[in-house]
Structures are given as C-alpha cells and as structure tokens.
Amino acid sequence: MLAPKKQKFRKAHKGRVASIAKAGTTLAFGSFGLKSIDGWRVTARQIEAGRKAATRCMKRQGRLWIRIFPDVPVSKKPAEVRMGKGKGSPEFFAVRVSPGRIMFEIEGVEENVALRALELVSAKLPVRTRIVRRYE
C-alpha cells in the first residue's frame, strides 16, 4: 500500500477538503482518466483496491497512472475508550481529494476496456467520479 517513507510529524490535524482543485485537473499521461466530482478523503486501501481492479480488468496490458498519493496520517482512538486522554495513534494514510482532481489515468488499451476499468475503480472510491477523455 502507498505510504510516505518519512514524515515531518507523526499526527496531522483533521483538516478540511479544499474547494475546487487548482492543480492536477487535466490529463497528463493517459488518454482516459477518472476525475472526482466530490471532495472527500480517499485512503491508501481504497487506492490499492482500485489499482488492483483496474490492472485485472486491463489484463496487465497498457499503463495505469495513480495521480494521488496518501500523505495525511489519520489517527483513531480504540473502541470503547472514554473521551480525552490525548489523540489516538495513527491508523492509516489518506489523501484529501478536491473536486475536479484527476485520480487515475489509463493508456495503451482499447477504449471499452479502459472505460470498464475506470468504472471498476470508481466503484472502489468514496467520491463521485466522471470519466474523461483526452480529446473531449
């Protein structure tokens, strides 16, 4: 799974997802891409599940780019623990995805295969998405 090699701080503030994405809104590598419509937090596990689904659908042909990276540590307190006594320990990493951000790109497979793969990826993610083409 994706995770940063080094971090400056162990724990992060909860934060908010920014409004419309300013960078990463156009296709950079592939001919087809998956663009977010909502802003939400996407975990490393969800990204990995999407990657596996897409590579399986593409039968390991073509190329898949993941344009997001989970760099925010999300902490959680154990179950049935009373309030207070500090912040919980880091549980997993996530990325804050803004609306309009390109998350996945595909190149080198037929159009129907690419669209099917991106639909499978979309089903694994907690945000509403749209499939975009390079020349649309």
Curated annotation (Swiss-Prot):
It comes from the Bacteria. InterPro entries: Ribosomal_uL16, Ribosomal_uL16_bact-type, Ribosomal_uL16_CS, Ribosomal_uL16_dom, Ribosomal_uL16_sf. GO terms for molecular function: rRNA binding; structural constituent of ribosome; tRNA binding. Keywords: Ribonucleoprotein, Ribosomal protein, RNA-binding, rRNA-binding, tRNA-binding. The keyword rRNA-binding applies. GO terms for cellular component: cytosolic large ribosomal subunit. CDD domains: Ribosomal_L16_L10e (cd01433). The keyword Nucleotide-binding does not apply. Pfam families: Ribosomal_L16. GO terms for biological process: translation. Binds 23S rRNA and is also seen to make contacts with the A and possibly P site tRNAs. Part of the 50S ribosomal subunit. Belongs to the universal ribosomal protein uL16 family. This is Large ribosomal subunit protein uL16. It comes from Rickettsia africae (strain ESF-5). The lineage of its organism: Bacteria, Pseudomonadati, Pseudomonadota, Alphaproteobacteria, Rickettsiales. The gene is rplP.
